[in-house]
Amino acid sequence: MNRRSFAQSVGSAVALSALAGSSTWAQSKSNAAPGRMMAIAAHPGDGLFTMGAVLAQQIQLGGAGALLSLSLGERGAPKDIPVQQYGEMQRTATQKAAHLLGAEAIFLSYPDAEIPFNEESTLQVCDAIRQYKPDVVVTHWSGSWHKDHQNCHLIVRDAVFYAGLETLARSNPAHGVAKMYYAENWEDATNFVVDTYVNIEPIYEKWLQACDFYPMWRGQTGFFRYNDYYSSLAVMRGCLSGVKHAAALMSDPGQRMQRLQSL
């Protein structure tokens, strides 16, 4: 196998131009636009840094996108900014970023570091899914050291189930989510296995501009070099998938089954 073939096949990952059913970098022969995508994150930064690029690409290709943040991530505040003030800065940054990308910003009100996995939180996310009606949901992988990320994963899995349950009466009718993916996040790396690449080159610079609204992206919180990590990660994933910049995802195990007459 030559180097080009290896780079395009490494990891046996599926390369997608958008999360719309195409299995190669080439655009689908169908003229159908990509569907609606909802990125559901524990904190706004997680949503934009790890899910924002695929959300922006979906919108760029004619789909629609929404970013749901379960908390404001206010406890990541630097020492010189009060926690509540930093939370509002996070909200404002998310609204500006979503506007730039053409997405809708939605917020729940759970305190940072205290997002609960219970019926109330699950039904709130279920209601958001039923209201927005996404075809694709992207969220956290379970293999995280962060309690909020772990709970967000569990909440979303159950919320997707509830959203599609016709016998569960809520304010909006049932809605089935066709596909679910998990985003690559430095905090959620345990047992994360890439099987899907999205070419984000068309929106890469716009995504960087959206991320730059966040103080933590600009290095003002001093905790982690988010800008260096995620911008470099997009380059690395692009190298492995044969494009300039890419985002890597893990598909839900329940949608990996193939039914073939032959190989």
Predicted regions and their residues:
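Metal-dependent de-N-acetylase/amidase catalytic core
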Residues: A7-S12, Q27-R36, I40, P116-L263
